[in-house]
Amino acid sequence: MEQPPGEAAEVREEEEKKEVAEAEGAPELNGGPERSLPSSSYTDLSRSSSPPSLLDQLQMGGDGASCGSLNMECRVCGDKASGFHYGVHACEGCKGFFRRTIRMKLEYEKCERICKIQKKNRNKCQYCRFQKCVALGMSHNAIRFGRMPEAEKRKLVAGLTANEGTQHNPQVADLKAFSKHIYNAYLKNFNMTKKKARGILTGKASHTAPFVIHDIETLWQAEKGLVWKQLVNGLPPYKEISVHVFYRCQCTTVETVRELTEFAKSIPSFSNLFLNDQVTLLKYGVHEAIFAMLASIVNKDGLLVANGTGFVTREFLRSLRKPFSDIIEPKFEFAVKFNALELDDSDLALFIAAIILCGDRPGLINVPQVEAIQDTILRALEFHLQANHPYAQYLFPKLLQKMADLRQLVTEHAQMMQRIKKTETETSLHPLLQEIYKDMY
């Protein structure tokens, strides 16, 4: 959704001031001591007051600024161009988008419309964005021979030849250490790992079998303490079962956002980013990460809830009235395909980190800094997959494609949430989720 004209103008003016400050080498703004987001207080969504925002979760003062002092516009989206990239004047976002698409051989779902690509919506249709890049003359050959700084040329060439002589690369030890750090952060911050979930689902874990929720009666039994006792108490009973299930989903989502925030803060260099960029990365990345991790607790028949003590059947969720019955089914379809890749928790840790540190999110300030962190994560992921899945030759490019699939899944989910907000007048969204969905795509 578009911002009100006055608000948008104020935001742009503030960003321009900060852009100048950064261009002049202004130091990164600092804030107070770090503090984690409190657990979700979820008594009545419609009465929540001053809830913790993404900014509160990060607990760092100040704000960021967009870089770049060029007046030249990006030929692709109209944002400020940062230079002459791959044959045309382009911004950092479109440069990175084109580079990743070519380098990672991504294929986007074909769009029959000719979407207008602008700064505010450039991530909405990746197919039309790439077609515009090509139509404007952005060149594949420019990746190696285009007009760009020598340092960047060397970096790209190194990336393109990453598969050659990996075992003799002096950075291998660093990549291993980096991967281990990310994995440890994952284990520390996420309560439900894939290993734990699959053990419960297959009955191999030394864990009481989950209580199966397959109809209204079993749901209310669960509400009386069989399953939900460890969740926040005080969720008011709603007469309509579909709305009640919807609110339970929000409870889980808000808690997972908290876990993801703590995980992100453990990723090397994340906390060195501008605060504005940290918030932006979380805003756009948390749902992609959530839906990727959701696959761990899903099988074709249903999903685990309440830390593995309950199991809600897929058929029961399908039986809810529309639009609530439409929310989860696309996630099941994605999860079944994603699980076929047979990733383990060490793979997922790096994959989730790569999702969060994505350099083409709308509104990012220091795109090169974010991309540099993601490049490190992707190199670590590729190397880790080669070691962990030596016979899965195309696993890395498949995961890169899954990142694009997740973005489309989240776009559709955000649009559905906005429709529910407008049409279901007696249904409220948690304020933190409202903040995330606002102006997303």
Curated annotation (Swiss-Prot):
Name a biological process GO annotation: fatty acid metabolic process
Similarity annotation? Belongs to the nuclear hormone receptor family. NR1 subfamily.
Keyword presence, Zinc-finger:
yes
Per UniProt, which keywords does this protein have?
Activator, DNA-binding, Metal-binding, Nucleus, Receptor, Transcription, Transcription regulation, Ubl conjugation, Zinc, Zinc-finger
Q: How does it assemble?
A: Heterodimer with the retinoid X receptor. Interacts (via domain NR LBD) with CRY1 and CRY2 in a ligand-dependent manner.
The region called Disordered is annotated at: 1-58
Which parts of the sequence belong to the NR LBD domain? 211-439
Q: Name one GO molecular function term.
A: linoleic acid binding
Which SUPFAM superfamilies does this chain map to? Glucocorticoid receptor-like (DNA-binding domain) (SSF57716), Nuclear receptor ligand-binding domain (SSF48508)
User: Which sections of the sequence are annotated for DNA binding?
Assistant: 70-145
State the protein's name. Peroxisome proliferator-activated receptor delta
For this UniProt entry, what's an example GO CC term? nucleus
Q: Where in the cell is it found?
A: Nucleus
Looking up SMART domains in the UniProt record yields: HOLI, ZnF_C4
- Is the keyword Zinc-finger in the record? yes
Where along the chain is composition biased (Low complexity)? 36-55
Entry comment on modification after translation: 'Lys-48'-linked polyubiquitinated; leading to proteasomal degradation. Deubiquitinated and stabilized by OTUD3.
- Gene responsible for this protein: PPARD
A Pfam family reported for this protein in Swiss-Prot or TrEMBL: zf-C4
